[in-house]
From Swiss-Prot:
UniProt-annotated stretches for the region Binding site for the cap structure m7GTP: 54-236
UniProt-recorded name of the protein: Nucleoprotein
Function, in words: Encapsidates the genome, protecting it from nucleases. The encapsidated genomic RNA is termed the nucleocapsid (NC). Serves as template for viral transcription and replication. The increased presence of protein N in host cell does not seem to trigger the switch from transcription to replication as observed in other negative strain RNA viruses.
The record's note on its domains: The N-terminal region is important for the cap-binding activity while the C-terminal region contains the 3'-5' exoribonuclease activity. A CCHE zinc binding site is present in the C-terminal region and may thus contribute to the substrate binding and/or the specificity of the exonuclease activity.
Complex and partners: Homomultimerizes to form the nucleocapsid. Binds to viral genomic RNA. Interacts with glycoprotein G2. Interacts with protein Z; this interaction probably directs the encapsidated genome to budding sites. Interacts with protein L; this interaction does not interfere with Z-L interaction. Interacts with host IKBKE (via Protein kinase domain); the interaction inhibits IKBKE kinase activity.
Site label Important for exonuclease activity, positions: D457
Gene it is expressed from: N
InterPro entries documented for this protein: Nucleocapsid_arenaviridae (IPR000229), Nucleocapsid_C_arenaviridae (IPR035084), Nucleocapsid_C_sf (IPR038115), Nucleocapsid_N_arenaviridae (IPR035083), RNaseH-like_sf (IPR012337)
Domain of life: Viruses
Molecular function in Gene Ontology: hydrolase activity; metal ion binding; RNA binding
Length: 564
């Protein structure tokens, strides 16, 4: 369906920022680390050659090869990149209506892109090569026919290549690359570039910066003179100094602001991201316009989110991804036949990952089904809510528990947490089965009450999984109270968890007058912490033998066997 009404573009952007704020983060240090590495390592003679090629009105195979080779080198240098991860949303990942909306949206995006790429305003393309199409246009102009589908400046830049699919994902700006190029090619210090782009980013929090704004800011920040005043167009590369590239870079280095540019898609949050996006879309009446032209904020977000299920949709390197959004994210609208009564779907259930088979999902469903929603259920995690590495659910009545692990995305943050809190080593959880933690959260009974010691992280974890229905009771023990049974619990139940093998060092500095005490202490294990908290409430050590509800074979990927 075509929509002719005007899009309130910036209002939509602000609404999406608010609605997806829980998925945004501060990424300035990561962007600058990549920018410095690119500035120090890349051959800027190659950059200049690519920029020259992209200024040509007709570009061929050699030009594309130069662009792809340079993009590959940039991708190799960057830590912030999107990787190839195809996703199929099925029943349980999203509600049926949400899946239908997503399928329709991706279909409309595909139509919009195809029309833009083929110049479809009633012009039959036929099975012609780019060079033949260009020749045909030249003949039509000679005969006095008006060229259809050209831009306002009459310039049509043409890629004459044998395989057009090689053009996919080779364009679009990357803030780290923009900052590096502005610094080196502009002969500036990186600090002055950062200050200038930060000003643009701050302006972007209240309006779309335009060329008049750029002129005014250039008076204060001389380095912005490098930003081109040409109108943006499709298929411009990250090596162009466009205003939109500068604004995106500025947005990425703001310390806060809930900027969409700082969203990261992971296998654990993908379905929650899509749910939240659809909620904002419905509330604001957003739509996809199939007519060729610039993408509106909703179209832009949906396309970027669905390009890869793992990476940085706006600001990461994505040149090594194959395919488009509608190729890499697909929707299964069928209903699977089930034997016996079907469990009601949980609105908050997260994305089913390819690593979990139907049998594994059935085992997890059975395990969660054994938890009694009418009795106390403790839940604790290790690691931040946005990147947890361990989760435990412990039900004292019945002596049952679910205990699982997850490989982190943020290795630096993980090492810091290991040193000062949980003592988990990467080698001990790198084979953790992906998807178990999120699947368990998605299966918890609706409106269940969960008991915690400190609820902020748990609330955020549930919100990220779309489980706002779950209720939390925070017992609010002091640090001393919570660790009262520390040694006794580790002695009795330490055999239940063998994944806390690092040395934990206290962050607190010792008072110079205090007696000497070893800085190391017992690590925090999510399962054993739950037992400690229950012991504190009981006023004595919990003594019952515990039963795991998940088999060990489900928690970790099988080790490869080597024959000698």
């Amino acid at each position: 369906m075509a929509h002719s009404k005007e899009v309130p573009s910036f209002r939509w952007t602000q609404s999406l920022r608010r609605g997806l704020s829980q998925f945004t983060q501060t990424v300035k240090s990561d962007v600058l680390k990549d920018a410095k590495l690119i500035a120090d390592s890349i051959d800027f003679n190659q950059v200049a050659q690519v920029q020259r090629a992209l200024r040509k009105t007709k570009r061929g195979e050699e030009d594309l090869n130069k662009l792809r080779d340079l993009n590959k080198e940039v991708d190799r240098l960057m830590s912030m990149r999107s990787v190839q991860r195809n996703t199929v949303f099925k029943a349980g990942d999203l509600g049926r209506v949400e899946r239908m909306e997503l399928a329709s949206g991706l279909g409309n995006l595909k139509t919009k892109f195809r029309r833009a790429e083929t110049g479809s305003q009633g012009v039959y393309m036929g099975n012609l090569s780019q060079s033949q199409l260009a020749k045909r246009s030249e003949i039509l102009r000679t005969l006095g026919f008006q060229q259809q589908g050209t831009g306002g400046n009459g310039v049509v830049r043409v890629w004459d290549v044998k395989d057009p699919s090689k053009l996919n994902n080779q364009f679009g700006s990357v803030p780290a690359l923009t900052i590096a190029c502005m610094t080196v090619q502009g002969g500036e210090t990186m600090n002055s570039v950062i200050q200038a782009l930060t000003s643009l980013g701050l302006l972007y929090t209240v309006k779309y910066p335009n060329l008049s704004d750029l002129d005014r800011l250039t008076q204060e920040h001389d380095c912005l003179q490098i930003v081109t005043k040409d109108e943006s167009s499709i298929n411009i590369s990250g090596y162009n100094f466009s205003l939109s590239a500068a604004v995106k870079a500025g947005a990425s280095i703001l310390d806060d602001g809930n900027m969409l540019e700082t969203i990261r898609v992971t296998p654990d949050n993908f379905s929650s991201l899509i749910k939240s996006t659809i909620q904002v879309k419905r509330r604001e009446g957003m739509f996809i316009d199939e007519k060729p032209g610039n993408r509106n904020p909703y179209e832009n977000l949906l396309y970027k989110l669905c390009l890869s299920g793992d990476g940085w949709p706006y600001i990461g390197s994505r040149s090594q991804i194959i395919g488009r959004s509608w190729d890499n994210t697909s929707i299964d609208l069928t209903r699977k036949p089930v034997a016996g009564p079907r469990q009601p779907e949980k609105n908050g259930q997260n994305l089913r990952l390819a690593n979990l088979t139907e049998i594994q999902e059935a085992v997890i469903r059975e395990a969660v089904g054994k938890l009694d929603p009418t009795n106390t259920l403790w839940l604790d995690i290790e690691g931040p809510a946005t990147d947890p590495v361990e989760m435990a659910l412990f039900q004292p009545a019945g002596s049952k528990y679910i205990h699982c692990f997850r490989k982190p995305h943020d290795e630096k943050g993980f090492k810091n947490g290991s040193r000062h809190s949980h003592g988990i080593l990467m080698k001990d959880i790198e084979d953790a089965m992906p998807g178990v933690l999120s699947y368990v959260i998605g299966l918890l009974p609706p409106d269940m009450v969960v008991t915690t010691q400190g609820s902020d992280d748990i609330r955020k974890l549930f919100d990220l999984h779309g489980r706002r229905d779950l209720k939390l009771v925070d017992v609010r023990l002091t640090s001393e109270q919570a660790r009262q049974f520390d040694q006794q619990v580790w002695e009795k139940f330490g055999h239940l968890c063998k994944h806390h093998n690092g040395v934990v060092v206290s962050k607190k500095k010792r008072d110079k007058d205090a007696p000497f005490k070893l800085a190391s202490s017992e690590p925090h294990c999510a399962l054993l912490d739950c037992i400690m908290f229950q012991s504190v409430l009981d006023g004595k050590l919990y003594e019952e033998e515990l039963t795991p509800l998940l088999p060990p074979s489900l928690l970790f990927l099988p080790k490869a066997a080597y024959a000698l």
